[in-house]
Regions:
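Conserved G1/Walker A P-loop phosphate-binding module
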Residues: 2-138
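Inter-motif core of Ras-like GTPase G domains
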Residues: 148-171, 181-190
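Canonical P-loop GTPase G-domain recognition
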Residues: 199-251
Length: 251
């Protein structure tokens, strides 16, 4: 029943998104009584590009889901990625910043040409993990490193993301650059929030609230009524996995 309902919907939705994208692009290229600000134009052009990408993705027999991890140094993005993958596919290190360039992890069953051009220019790593056949995992540069180019690299990749996991930890869950990018992109893609290293969370934040409650309070003030917030212990799970007792359900 589900397949018979979803397939006609996808066939209808894809051309509708393509038409909407073309209409928006034509409107942007036309004349306007009042000139558009650079910020408004950039946002609308980004929306038109998103519509085009989504229309093309829905035309595929099996659309790919791009899951992007975003966060600062030392929050455990690479470790979390390994935990989500159910095996070691990303290199985690104590050297910081660990992630200097975007790394795209895709299943061996996916032909590289199916990847978005923005992803094809990143470092590509093939995996054979069950359950990742239609999922692309992207580990992005650390936002709060001294390399300002990291932000630009992330900005080039964000339009490709279907889901962004905003990863933080007890010490670092509301960094300025990450929060600004989140506010800019929140209307255009799905965000979920991860507080990693939760096993170390034993003290309140400077506001007197626990980190998860402090983050939820900030999200509520920005208009999020029911944000997805996950509290994880990725390293603990990876360690258990190494001895054969790990389960993603306990992540």
């Amino acid at each position: 029943m589900e397949a018979t309902l979803s397939e006609p919907l996808l066939r209808t939705l894809s051309p509708a998104l393509a038409d909407l994208g073309r209409s928006l692009r034509a409107w942007l290229d036309g004349k306007h009584r009042y000139p558009l600000s650079a910020l408004v134009r950039a946002n609308l052009e980004g929306m038109a590009t998103d519509l085009h990408r989504q229309a093309e993705a829905l035309q595929m027999e099996k659309p790919l889901l791009v899951i992007m991890l975003m966060g600062g140094t030392g929050v455990g993005k690479s470790t979390l990625l390994n935990a989500l993958a159910g095996g070691t596919i990303a290199q985690a290190s104590f050297a910081r910043p660990t992630t200097r360039d975007p790394v795209v992890y895709y299943h061996q069953s996916i032909q590289p040409h199916r990847l978005d051009p923005a992803l094809q220019h990143c470092k590509l790593v093939v995996n054979d993990r069950p359950g990742l056949e239609q999922k692309i995992l992207v580990d992005t540069p650390d936002l709060d490193s001294n390399d300002l180019a990291n932000r630009e690299k992330l900005m080039q990749l964000l339009p490709v993301a279907d889901i962004v996991l905003y990863v933080g930890s007890q010490e670092k869950y509301h960094d300025k650059l990450g929060w600004e990018l989140f506010l800019q992109q929140r209307q255009r893609r799905a965000f979920a929030f991860v507080l990693n290293k939760w096993d170390r969370c034993q003290r309140e934040s400077t506001t007197g609230l626990a980190p998860d409650q402090d983050l939820l309070k900030d999200l509520e003030e920005e208009g999020f009524q029911n944000p997805l917030l996950f509290r994880t212990c990725a390293q603990v799970w990876v360690d258990r996995m190494a001895v054969g007792s790990g389960s993603r359900q306990s992540l």
